[in-house]
Amino acid sequence: MTPEHLPTEQYEAQLAEKVVRLQSMMAPFSDLVPEVFRSPVSHYRMRAEFRIWHDGDDLYHIIFDQQTKSRIRVDSFPAASELINQLMTAMIAGVRNNPVLRHKLFQIDYLTTLSNQAVVSLLYHKKLDDEWRQEAEALRDALRAQNLNVHLIGRATKTKIELDQDYIDERLPVAGKEMIYRQVENSFTQPNAAMNIQMLEWALDVTKGSKGDLLELYCGNGNFSLALARNFDRVLATEIAKPSVAAAQYNIAANHIDNVQIIRMAAEEFTQAMNGVREFNRLQGIDLKSYQCETIFVDPPRSGLDGETEKMVQAYPRILYISCNPETLCKNLETLSQTHKVERLALFDQFPYTHHMECGVLLTAK
C-alpha cells in the first residue's frame, strides 16, 4: 500500500486474515466466530493530517514512511474522504503563491463529515497577525465559492485563530434515527464514519431489552452514550477532556435526549467516587447511589483498562467493551473472564489495509 494507491483488490483477503487473527487471540476466552463489519474499500477516513514540504517555489503534502522515515509526496489520498481530496488540491492551490499563508506553514489537518462539512487547520512556526487573518479569510471565501463548506483555523505556539468556528456537525443515520454529533477540531472523533455507524448499531443490538441504567467510561463527545440512551432508563457517562464534554453537552441538547448525564472526570477518579474513597465537588447534585447501572460500557485508549478499573467493571452484570487494541483487550480478559463470559464478539474493520483491528465484546456475569 502507498498513500496514493489502495490495494482494493486485496480487501477481502486482508479482512479474512484479521478474522483469523482475532479468533486466534480470543480462543482462550471464547469459541465464537466474530460478527464481521466491513469498511468501504476507499474514501473511509474522515480526518487526516499532513506535513507540508517547501521545495523551492513548489509546496505539497507529505507523510513519512513509518519504517524508513523517508518523505513521501501525497497529492491525493484515496483512504480519505472525497471532500478531503478536493480540499487537498484546493488548499495547495490557494496557499502556494500566497507569501503570507505559505511562510512557515508546516502542517495541514483536515476534519470532514458525511454531511460534507470541513474544518481545516493550518499550523505555523511563526506568529499569526491581522494580515494572516485577512489572507485566510480571502482563501476561505474562495474555497466556499467552489462549493466547499469549510471553516479555517490558524494555529501557532500558544495561538489559535478561528475564522468562524472550530467545529462541524456530523449527522449519522443510526438504526432508523438521525444522530447529530458536534465534532471539535483537535479532539478525538471516530475516523471511519461508515464504520462508526455499524459500531453504534451493533452496540444497540447487543443491548436491546436492557434493564436499568448504563454507565460509560471515556465517553468523548457522547458518540456511544447518546446512541445507546434509547435502550436504557438513564445513562451516566464520564469524560476528562473539556472540549469533548462541551461537545457532548451540545449533542445531548441537539438530539433532544433527556436521560444522559455527563461528568467531567477521569475513569480512575470515578472509580474512587463510586467506591466512596473520595468525594468530588463536581459530583454535587448527582446522586450516584440512585443509578441502577446493570451495564457498563468502556471504549478505552490503546493501553486498555487499568487494574483498578478492571476490578470496578467486574461489579456490573454486563460489560460492553469496544477495543481499538485486541492485545490489551485480551490482557483485560484474563481478569474479566474470571467473573464474566463472552456472549457476543464483533470485528470492525476501522483501518483497512493495516494490521490494526477494532473489536467489540459483550460480557455477562457467570
From Swiss-Prot:
GO MF, one annotated term: rRNA binding
CDD domains given in the database record: AdoMet_MTases (cd02440)
InterPro entries for the chain: MeTrfase_TrmA_AS, MeTrfase_TrmA_CS, SAM-dependent_MTases_sf, TrmA_MeTrfase, U5_MeTrfase_fam
GO biological process: tRNA methylation
Binding site for S-adenosyl-L-methionine: Q190, Y218, N223, E239, D299
Enzyme class: transferase
Keyword entries, A-Z: Methyltransferase, S-adenosyl-L-methionine, Transferase, tRNA processing
Known EC number: 2.1.1.-, 2.1.1.35
Disulfide bridge partners, by residue number: none
Gene3D superfamilies: 2.40.50.1070, Vaccinia Virus protein VP39 (3.40.50.150)
Catalysed conversion reaction: uridine(54) in tRNA + S-adenosyl-L-methionine = 5-methyluridine(54) in tRNA + S-adenosyl-L-homocysteine + H(+); uridine(341) in tmRNA + S-adenosyl-L-methionine = 5-methyluridine(341) in tmRNA + S-adenosyl-L-homocysteine + H(+)
Active-site feature positions: C324, E358
One annotated Gene Ontology cellular component of this protein: cytosol
Function: Dual-specificity methyltransferase that catalyzes the formation of 5-methyluridine at position 54 (m5U54) in all tRNAs, and that of position 341 (m5U341) in tmRNA (transfer-mRNA).
Family indicated by similarity: Belongs to the class I-like SAM-binding methyltransferase superfamily. RNA M5U methyltransferase family. TrmA subfamily.
Protein name (database record): tRNA/tmRNA (uracil-C(5))-methyltransferase
Species this chain originates from: Escherichia coli (strain SMS-3-5 / SECEC)
